Amino acid sequence: MTPHINAKIGDFHPQCILCGDPLRVSYIAKNFLQDAREITNVRNMLGFSGKYKGKEISLMGHGMGIASCTIYVTELVKTYQVKELLRIGTCGAISPKVGLRDIIMVTGASTDSKTNRIRFLNHDLSATPDFELSLRAYQTAKRLEIDLKVGNIFTSDFFYSFETHAFDLLAKYNHLGIEMEAAGLYATAMELSAKALCLCSVSDHLITKEALSPKERIESFNNMIILALEMMG
């Protein structure tokens, strides 16, 4: 047990899928897993363990932003010996290379947060995913005939007040979208010798102002859930 997770030791399996929204975690458990059981609920940040096609797998919410995400990642790895962490979330696109419903495999995460600089003695940390997980995601997407987009993401500490004039600069440097956790996830996994990867479904486009309806978001997210479960299974 930790300050934020009340699961018993052994409740979490070595492979864990992460979502910012605990209700998405519950949705996946109820609609995609067999023998799913709730194993933690501190602060209503839900976690489940179950099976997908006979393979044991766990699910965990992590909240919004680097600070919240890294708390849960640290406790999952250090206390519960989780070895592989796959975050599936949404992002806002800033590049013409991607559109609504596209799934992005995040190969690198820049950030306006100081957390990684503090962690890395004020140097620039290359926040990147595990190669094996990335390869599995790419190969699984090919098998499922999912057109997986590959590129960098910008992880921001801001949801409402990010500098919109920077969108063109980010796109120039092959940043496909903006979200709030990947840079922290990757850095924490690197520090703790765990494997991590982030997949993001494009829910809105910050340049064209297009956005999915709530129903369309669910349908789009389902494709990413299946990709995640298939590659981790």
From Swiss-Prot:
- Quote the record's binding site residues for a purine D-ribonucleoside: 4, 179-181, 203-204
The answer on whether this UniProt entry bears the keyword Disulfide bond reads: no
Output this protein's name: Purine nucleoside phosphorylase DeoD-type
Q: How does it assemble?
A: Homohexamer; trimer of homodimers.
Q: Which GO terms describe its biological process?
A: purine nucleoside catabolic process
Binding positions (phosphate): 20, 24, 43, 87-90
- Enzyme Commission number: 2.4.2.1
Q: Which NCBIfam families match?
A: deoD, PRK05819.1
Instruction: Say what the protein does.
Output: Catalyzes the reversible phosphorolytic breakdown of the N-glycosidic bond in the beta-(deoxy)ribonucleoside molecules, with the formation of the corresponding free purine bases and pentose-1-phosphate.
The record's top EC class is transferase
Entry-linked Pfam families: PNP_UDP_1
Q: Which InterPro entries match?
A: DeoD-type, Nucleoside_phosphorylase_CS, Nucleoside_phosphorylase_d, Nucleoside_phosphorylase_sf
